[in-house]
Design a protein with these regions (language model features):
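Positively charged, small/polar-rich N-terminal and surface patches that mediate targeting and assembly
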Residues: 1-102
Length: 102
C-alpha cells in the first residue's frame, strides 16, 4: 500500500487557550485537528497533574497531520498563541494512507 509523507504537529497548551489556538490554525488553512485532554506530565517546572499546578482547566493536546508544505503556516499561527502561554510544540515525520485528506 502506498503511503505519503506528512508532518505530525502536537501542541500542548493550557485548556483555556484551545479555542484561540484552533481558530488561529483554521485561519492558517489547517483543515483538521484532534483535541485531547492531557492528564498530567513533567517538565521544566516539575511534575504536574490536571488537578494540581495547572488548575482545574488543565492542559490539552492539539494534534494535526498536515502536508509538509503547510508546516510553516501552521507553526506561525501556533506561535502567535503559544509564545505567551504555557505550551510545547513538537513536530515529527509521519506517513498517511490518504494524502487527499491532508
Amino acid at each position: 500500500m502506498q503511503t505519503h509523507k506528512a508532518k505530525r504537529v502536537e501542541i500542548i497548551i493550557e485548556a483555556p487557550m484551545e479555542r484561540r489556538l484552533t481558530e488561529a490554525l483554521l485561519r492558517a488553512g489547517v483543515t483538521g485537528f484532534t483535541v485531547l485532554p492531557v492528564m498530567g506530565g513533567s517538565g521544566r517546572s516539575g511534575h504536574w497533574t490536571r488537578e494540581g499546578q495547572v488548575g482545574r482547566a488543565g492542559m490539552v493536546a492539539v494534534i494535526c497531520l498536515i502536508r509538509p508544505d503547510r508546516l510553516d503556516a501552521l507553526l506561525d499561527a501556533a506561535f502567535t498563541v503559544v509564545e505567551r502561554h504555557i505550551g510545547v510544540v513538537s513536530i515529527t515525520e509521519a506517513e498517511v494512507l490518504r494524502a487527499e485528506r491532508f
